[in-house]
Amino acid sequence: MRAAVRSTSLALAASLAACAPAARDRGVSPDAPLPARMKVADAGAGRAVFRQCAACHTINEGTGDRDGPNLYGVTRAQVGHNSQRFGYTAALQSVGGRWTCARLDRWLTNPAAFVPGTSMRFPGLRNGLDRADVIAFLYANGGGTPDCR
């Protein structure tokens, strides 16, 4: 009986470890500077993390907005102006400039801290590798190659 419980526990632990973000496998800490995280960023892993975002956002070209704007091409867009149909807050529109890797990283860390007055209710992604993966995924969807030095 103990052997069965032990092997079940080991199998469960191995399964959970396979699902967890593997910072060790990438050789970069989630707290490493953004350029180091972007060197190991994985757009495929970013697609999986983006599922959280898909509750409010779409990503395919030409797809309409939801509670949040469509994000196709956002990495080439001016902050607060990616979708002509979405009603961005004045706070977000006042940021100015374009989305950069650094800006996206700050936004994805804590949107309300980066832009007080934003309507985005998402609390942010704590894991820096998850943020880098999402940034890579956004660049892969209408944004070209990230320049995140």
Where are these regions (language model features)?
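Bacterial N-terminal signal peptides that target proteins for export
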Residues: 1-9
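The canonical Cys-X-X-Cys-His
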Residues: 46, 50-59, 134-138
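C-terminal capping alpha-helices of c-type cytochrome domains
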Residues: 98-149
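Secreted/processed peptides and extracellular or luminal domains of membrane proteins
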Residues: 25, 59-62
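Electrostatic cytochrome c docking/interface patches
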Residues: 21-49
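Sequence contexts marking disulfide-bonded cysteines in secreted/extracellular proteins
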Residues: 20, 54-57, 147-149
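C-terminal motif of bacterial Sec signal peptides marking the signal peptidase cleavage site
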Residues: 16-18
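Gly/Gly-Pro-rich "capping" loops immediately C-terminal to redox-active cysteine motifs
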Residues: 47, 61-98, 122-124
